[in-house]
């Protein structure tokens, strides 16, 4: 089941095990059970620390990752390959006794949860943001015996996942808990546990504090650290929106990579320098005083710095039409790579004729029954090579000069209405899912009245990446820089860093 290269990598990782692990498998006579049995046997053959026993569990096929004679609460229902294979390997290492790479303060928060908490996460194996949630809840299960977690592959357990329209979908004790990417800190916050503000209030002032974790932030942090400046990053997650990007083929010198790989490499590069990286928390306010620039965090802690670089990126732009908000995660989606498999053999729409929209339509055409692409303009805006590929597909329709007006459906999406801009006629297309790909909205709601924003909510900067407030700089997709590309954001981050350094020298 595992190819030679993957086996070699796995062999090296399993050598890091620090104790014994027992797979407790619930298997039937079906094909998926046979596939799971083959996978578990292959892994057991690679390490003397792994044994397999069979036992009836809640779902078949499934298996728990336990210590001999001790249940950890970690279960995989289905076959955790694809993006979830890393989740399985990490669970094995942590259950074996390998210390988690998590801050002690977070570990203490997890230990302090009283519970019991029984989590279930529905995933698709092509979902790039699902492993973050699975790995976070698995870690919590390893640390706290009052927590259990089951990963459920929706493609295997279709009856259970029939009404799941977006992944990851997390349930706590049978009730919906959350959708989309969540960090350990996000989960802890939803459970009522917050980071101690004193952990942040006791920090010495920075020379440069970078707010955000994407490509611009990473670039800025590395450049300022190399200048010998005391540098800090405060961010929800390293990689930012790039984490949700499937393929990256235009980052020069790297022919092809994925968003998750890029983000992982960025985090590793940042870790090579003396940079105080604070993740899992967001900024809520910024103000300049006579002595310093003060950044307030969501736990009310305050960080001080001589300069600040704002690089909080952007989020998916919504259609803002009736029915959309009500049916998000119920047929309205934003990530085709994550949620596409949930619409296998169904009819879907993609809204947006730029590169992202056309790429989404191409990817979805290989999974779903039919794709209808809507573009407001009179022609598509995507690169010609993508348009040619799209038009060659037999199960794709393209509607230009189409203004979407309403998402239709009661409990779930059943259609979309649009106006033909050439005729003025209103029409309805019956379908099961809608993927919105119409660009991004800058994450600047926390900056109102702090720095100058344009009519689109973007931070206005000059050629030095400086804002209208001395000492506050900005870079990346959060700014009014016209073109939004990873490579451009990284250059902007470096430019902001060098000009922040120059500002410190002169002030």
From Swiss-Prot:
It is an enzyme of class 1 (oxidoreductase). The keyword NADP applies. Keywords: Disulfide bond, FAD, Flavoprotein, NAD, NADP, Oxidoreductase, Redox-active center. NAD(+) binds at residues 347-361. InterPro entries: AhpF_NTD_C (IPR044141), AhpF_NTD_N (IPR044142), Alkyl_hydroperoxide_Rdtase_suF (IPR012081), FAD/NAD-bd_sf (IPR036188), FAD/NAD-binding_dom (IPR023753), Ferredoxin-NADP_redctase_2 (IPR050097), Pyr_nucl-diS_OxRdtase_2_AS (IPR008255), Thioredoxin-like_fold (IPR012336). One of its GO terms (biological process) is response to reactive oxygen species. Binds 1 FAD per subunit. It holds the Pfam family Pyr_redox_2. Its EC number is 1.8.1.-. Its cofactor is FAD. FAD binds at residues 207-222, 467-477. GO terms for molecular function: flavin adenine dinucleotide binding; NAD binding; NADH-dependent peroxiredoxin activity; oxidoreductase activity, acting on a sulfur group of donors, NAD(P) as acceptor. Disulfide bonds join 335-338. Serves to protect the cell against DNA damage by alkyl hydroperoxides. It can use either NADH or NADPH as electron donor for direct reduction of redox dyes or of alkyl hydroperoxides when combined with the AhpC protein. Homodimer. Belongs to the class-II pyridine nucleotide-disulfide oxidoreductase family. The active site is a redox-active disulfide bond. This is Alkyl hydroperoxide reductase subunit F. It comes from Staphylococcus epidermidis (strain ATCC 35984 / DSM 28319 / BCRC 17069 / CCUG 31568 / BM 3577 / RP62A).
């Amino acid at each position: 089941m595992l190819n030679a290269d993957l086996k070699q990598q796995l062999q090296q990782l399993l050598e890091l095990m620090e104790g014994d692990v027992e797979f407790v498998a619930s298997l039937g006579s079906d094909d998926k059970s046979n596939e799971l049995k083959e996978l578990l046997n292959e892994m057991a053959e690679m390490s003397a620390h792994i044994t397999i026993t069979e036992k009836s569990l809640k779902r078949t096929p499934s298996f728990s990752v336990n210590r001999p004679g001790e249940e950890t609460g970690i279960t995989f229902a289905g076959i955790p390959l694809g993006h979830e294979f890393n989740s399985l390997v990490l669970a094995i290492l942590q259950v074996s006794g390998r210390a988690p790479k998590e801050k002690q303060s977070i570990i203490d928060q997890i230990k302090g949860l009283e519970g019991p908490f029984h989590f279930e996460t529905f995933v698709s194996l092509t979902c790039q943001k699902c492993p973050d949630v699975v790995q976070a809840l698995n870690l919590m299960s390893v640390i706290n015996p009052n927590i259990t977690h089951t990963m459920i592959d929706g493609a295997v357990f279709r009856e259970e996942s029939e009404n799941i329209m977006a992944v990851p979908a997390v349930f706590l004790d049978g009730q919906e808990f959350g959708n989309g990417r969540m960090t350990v800190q996000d989960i802890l916050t939803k459970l009522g546990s917050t980071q101690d503000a004193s952990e942040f209030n006791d920090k010495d002032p920075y020379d440069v504090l970078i707010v955000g974790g994407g490509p611009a932030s990473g670039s800025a942090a590395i450049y300022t650290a190399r200048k010998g400046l005391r540098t800090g990053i405060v961010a929800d997650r390293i990689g930012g929106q790039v984490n949700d990007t499937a393929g990256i083929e235009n980052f020069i010198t790297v022919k092809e990579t994925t968003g998750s790989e890029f983000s992982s490499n960025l985090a590793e590069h940042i870790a090579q320098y003396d940079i105080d990286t604070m993740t899992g928390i967001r900024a809520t306010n910024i103000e300049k005083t006579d002595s310093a620039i003060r950044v307030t965090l969501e736990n009310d802690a305050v960080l001080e710095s001589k300069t600040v670089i704002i690089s909080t990126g952007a989020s998916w732009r919504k259609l803002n039409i009736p029915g959309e908000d009500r049916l998000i995660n119920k047929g309205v989606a934003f990530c085709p790579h994550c949620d596409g498999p949930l619409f296998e053999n169904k009819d879907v729409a993609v809204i947006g004729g730029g590169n992202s929209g056309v790429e989404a339509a191409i990817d979805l055409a290989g999974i779903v029954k039919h794709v209808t692409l809507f573009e407001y303009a009179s022609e598509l805006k995507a690169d010609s090579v993508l348009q040619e590929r799209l038009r060659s597909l037999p199960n794709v329709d393209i509607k230009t000069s189409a203004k979407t007006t309403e998402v239709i459906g009661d409990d779930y999406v059943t259609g979309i209405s649009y106006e033909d801009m050439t005729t003025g006629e209103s029409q309805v297309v019956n379908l099961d899912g809608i993927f919105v790909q119409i660009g991004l909205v800058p994450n600047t709601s926390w900056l109102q009245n702090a720095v100058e924003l344009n009519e689109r909510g973007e931070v206005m900067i000059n050629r030095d990446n400086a804002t209208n407030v001395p000492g506050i700089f900005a870079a990346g997709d959060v700014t009014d820089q016209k073109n939004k590309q990873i490579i451009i954001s990284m250059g902007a981050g470096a430019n902001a860093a060098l000009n922040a350094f120059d500002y410190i020298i002169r002030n």
